[in-house]
């Protein structure tokens, strides 16, 4: 247990809203490393995230250099190369009656192009997996985790990074591609990823090399008041 901070030390609504409104997805970073004390502050904030069933079953993989992130991305693209049959035309055609129209459209319109972008860009020396970020964190669960827990913890980490002037971006496409099959298991083992997990998110951090002056006004699909 610890003593709760005084209320006057907490941000007010306007400050919190300003932090959230200023956030833009940043994928271009200076080469400067994220200091160890800032990494610990991000983790300290993420540890405060609420969970469905205490104690937390959230796990975090930390890649704390551009070189580590490039190595992970290279291995991920090599792994995807061996799975290209998974998004081949013949396989998608065969699976359409089994998994339905919506899943077919998802794989045809998003997953297959994603494979091409990841693999093709890496062959050109461009990392579109984690963008050679100075820092990335992968939040994932265990077989017993509330599916929302890793996502909430990742969100807290992102906000903490933003509060210290770091650029951040959530990356959701890596996680589902390393969950199933023998090749995925070997990939996870190589990188010390302990469990499969229903939900998981990567967050990348770094000192931004781009500056935005405008934000995007976001809305929900619907808001129903009963």
Question: Model-found features: residue ranges?
Answer:
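Acidic, surface-exposed loops and disordered segments
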Residues: 1-226
């Amino acid at each position: 247990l610890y003593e709760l901070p005084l209320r006057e030390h907490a941000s007010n609504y306007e400050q919190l809203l300003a932090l959230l409104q200023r956030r833009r997805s940043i994928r271009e970073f200076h080469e400067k490393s994220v200091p160890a004390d800032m990494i610990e502050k991000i983790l300290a904030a993420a540890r405060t995230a609420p969970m469905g069933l205490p104690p937390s079953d959230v796990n975090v993989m930390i890649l704390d250099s551009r070189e580590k992130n490039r190595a992970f991305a290279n291995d991920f693209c090599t792994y995807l190369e061996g799975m290209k049959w998974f998004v081949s035309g013949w396989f998608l055609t065969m699976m359409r009656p089994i998994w339905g129209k919506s899943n077919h459209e998802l794989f045809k319109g998003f997953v297959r192009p994603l494979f091409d972008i990841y693999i093709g860009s890496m062959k050109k020396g461009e990392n579109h997996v984690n963008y050679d970020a100075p820092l990335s964190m992968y939040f994932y669960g265990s077989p017993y985790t509330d599916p929302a827990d890793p996502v909430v913890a990742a969100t807290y980490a992102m906000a903490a990074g933003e509060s210290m002037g770091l650029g951040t971006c959530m990356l959701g496409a890596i996680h589902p591609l390393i969950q199933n099959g023998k090749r995925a298991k070997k990939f996870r083992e190589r990188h010390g990823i302990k469990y499969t997990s229903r939900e998981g998110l990567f967050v990348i951090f770094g000192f931004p090399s781009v500056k935005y002056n405008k934000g995007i006004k976001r809305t929900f699909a619907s808001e129903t008041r009963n």
